[in-house]
């Protein structure tokens, strides 16, 4: 079951903070922009991953769709993971870039990860993940999250920033 919060997702007590990224190595709008400022090492690693993938695949970036890369970060003495969910191949303005199948695969990968770890971890997602700059439909994305975590015993947090 999803639990909704209002405020800054980075004030949460989540063990994992998830956000959607594209497969092109462009990281800077939406919550990714906040992450870039707060945790520049996450953006650096993301760029390395996408560049290596592009080089190894002959420029075919869509192979990253549905995958996840995660990195531990520290904020005010608290460690947690930032998880990049590769839920869109491209980016731009005025279009739908979210690939629902890919986002679903990535969310399921997060679910598998927390299940394997065997702890009742808290997993946080920004409200309307994949729906702002990526143009997705929140009803569809919310259905993906609900179907993936319907029986999860830990907490799944949805954070709506006060400015939204």
Region locations from a protein language model:
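Macrodomain-like recognition of ADP-ribose-binding/processing modules
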Residues: 1-164
């Amino acid at each position: 079951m999803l639990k909704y919060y209002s405020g800054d997702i980075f004030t949460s007590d989540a063990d994992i903070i998830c956000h959607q990224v594209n497969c092109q190595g462009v990281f800077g709008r939406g919550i990714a922009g906040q992450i870039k400022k707060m945790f520049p090492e996450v953006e650096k690693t993301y760029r390395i991953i996408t560049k290596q993938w592009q080089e190894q695949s002959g420029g075919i970036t869509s192979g990253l769709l549905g995958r996840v890369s995660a990195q531990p970060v520290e904020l005010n003495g608290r460690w947690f993971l930032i998880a990049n969910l590769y839920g869109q191949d491209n980016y731009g303005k005025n279009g739908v870039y979210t690939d629902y199948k890919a986002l679903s695969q990535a969310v399921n990968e997060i679910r598998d990860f927390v299940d394997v770890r065997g702890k009742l971890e808290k997993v946080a997602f920004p409200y309307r993940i994949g729906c702002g700059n990526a143009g997705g439909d929140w009803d569809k994305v919310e259905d993906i999250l609900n179907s993936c975590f319907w029986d999860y015993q830990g907490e799944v947090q949805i954070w709506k920033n006060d400015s939204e």
